[in-house]
Amino acid sequence: MGEVKHLQINYKTDELFADFREFGNKNLYMIEELKGQMIDASSDSPFYGIFVGNKLVARMALLDKGEVEETYFPNSNYYILLWKLEVLDTYQRRGYAKQLLNFAKENKKPIKAIARNNSKAFFLTQGFKDVATKNPEGHDILIWNP
């Protein structure tokens, strides 16, 4: 299995994400986010991925939130928003999502995730807790504490 790599934001990033647009949820495309960040090549990329050969097969964004999330993490000044965890169809069920999630957990900060595309059961098996609340789009909110 490949290692998790920090993805830089540059002209190639859109090419790397092209396969995800062909099958995925349009809310996960990251097009506008990329365009906004490509302007400043020095910006710190929140994107991480796993390659098989030269092909990006799994990706996610980790957004470090500095404000206190009183509702879910009252004892923490920082948490991570795990955003857009996605694995290409032909590479699913091979452990790539779990590998990305374990990479996020290595930060030893609380994590907040939104369960989209029937991913709630996966997050629950990985130690996340259902907070019995939905985001404005109707997706379940899950949290993980170190």
Curated annotation (Swiss-Prot):
Class of enzymatic activity (EC top level): transferase
Coiled-coil features, chain-numbered ranges: none
A Pfam family: Acetyltransf_10
Domain of life where this protein originates: Bacteria
InterPro entries xref list: Acyl_CoA_acyltransferase (IPR016181), GNAT_dom (IPR000182), YlbP (IPR017274)
A GO molecular-function annotation: acyltransferase activity, transferring groups other than amino-acyl groups
Signal peptide: none
EC number(s) reported in the record: 2.3.1.-
N-acetyltransferase domain boundaries: 7-146
Annotated PROSITE patterns: GNAT (PS51186)
Keyword terms of this UniProt record: Acyltransferase, Transferase
NCBIfam families (alphabetical): PRK13688.1
Protein name: Uncharacterized N-acetyltransferase SERP0741
Species this chain originates from: Staphylococcus epidermidis (strain ATCC 35984 / DSM 28319 / BCRC 17069 / CCUG 31568 / BM 3577 / RP62A)
